[in-house]
Each structure stands twice: as C-alpha cells, then as structure tokens.
Amino acid sequence: MRQKLLAAGLGNEVLVDSAGTHAWHRGEPPDPRSVTHAQRRGYELTGLRARPVTQADFESCDFILAMDWDNLTLLEEMCPPQHRTKLGRLSQHARQSKAPVIPDPYQGGAAGFEHVLDLVEDACDGFVEFLRQKKDARRVGTS
C-alpha cells in the first residue's frame, strides 16, 4: 500500500499501518514466506512487527480494512459505534478481482502467497484510486 500511495503522490498524506484482530504473534516479524514473496515484487516487510488492533486505532484511523469476513466481524465487535463507518474489506476496492475476501495464504504453498499478493495489489490499486477521487472531490468542493 505504501509504495502505491507514493507512486500516486499520496505517500505524504496517508499513514499506513497493519494490525491483527488477535495478539497471538505480537512483536513477531512477518512469516518468512511472506517476506520472500513480497521481496520478489519489490516490497520490504522486514521492519514490520505484529501488533493487535487497539481502541486507539478506531479513534485515529480514517479507514480500517479487513482481509476477510471473520476479521471484519471481529473489528465490528471491537469498534465503538461512532467509528463503524471506518470499517470495510480491502477486497471491496479491487478493480479486477471479484473475490469477496483476501484469503489466508498459509495453506496454499508458494502459489497461495502469489495469489494473495495479486489480490492485495489489485485491491490496493483500487483503494489508492478511491483516495485520489476523495481528494479530488474535496479540492473541487473548496475551490
């Protein structure tokens, strides 16, 4: 997401973060297979560490995008009612794929990781375009 925002000229306007709905892997780096497949596409994940979603995230974030329905449901349960409009699925922004969710890659071997990266890239492209359109609409509305 960060690289796509930078390429779109939005890198200095959007803070990207990642968090999980469970604290099982708190403080751990990404799975080595994720790192390897991401690096093949030019993405650097080595500085990332797992952390759980916190109540502060619901306050400070403009968008909180889940990868699948189960995680979206957990986020809805955790989220204060006044912030539920910030929640959604990353896949709803996909431009090519019609997959309703981005699946867990861990059971699909190398092909599973590549498929998930394809889905994430497509959805991130769509989300960046969504943000660009929102920015353009604000600019037109204030002119």
Language model region names:
Residues M1-S143:
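Short polar/charged helix/loop
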